[in-house]
Amino acid sequence: MSGALKTPFYDLHKRLGGKLVNYANYLLPISYPSQTHIESHLHVRSKAGIFDVSHMLQHRLVGAEASKFLESLVPTDIGAVKPGSCHLSTFLNDKGGVVDDTIITKVGENEIYFVSNGATSDKISAYITAALNEFQNGSHGLKYDNFKKSLVAIQGPTAHLHLSKALKTDLSKIFFGNHFFLENGEKVI
């Protein structure tokens, strides 16, 4: 595991006794001493679970042609997606084959946030950059960046109750496929 990177939650995983393995060149927990794999799975399916996904590559695309550009890479009609909505999609190669999957969030008419797999960060980054250079040809003014920051996934039928309490925020109007962002502890929609 030498050389593997640590997420911002590494110390917490260690303190909680997480069994860490190298995944996508990050030290991530696959289990904790309080539950077996099956117990953990059943707990998430019946209640809730939280996962450190900080190893995943996050992307931000801003500009008037953001939807048009992303539509050249995925089979999703981004223009028809309402701001505030999220969609599971796939990046496609020139022949229509799947390069990787992604979750796309339309933040606003001219801003798109999406997340791709951590294990394919270099491949996806190069794929998007090459496509953007070809698309832009110096005339579209799109701004693109990708980054790895703290990111957690909270799943399960009672996840919203726990998250509402922790954030002191009413999540009753945030339904499946909707989003909100927290920046410096403040809710940004």
Where are the model-predicted features located?
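Glycine/proline-enriched, intrinsically flexible loops and inter-domain linkers
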Residues: 1-189
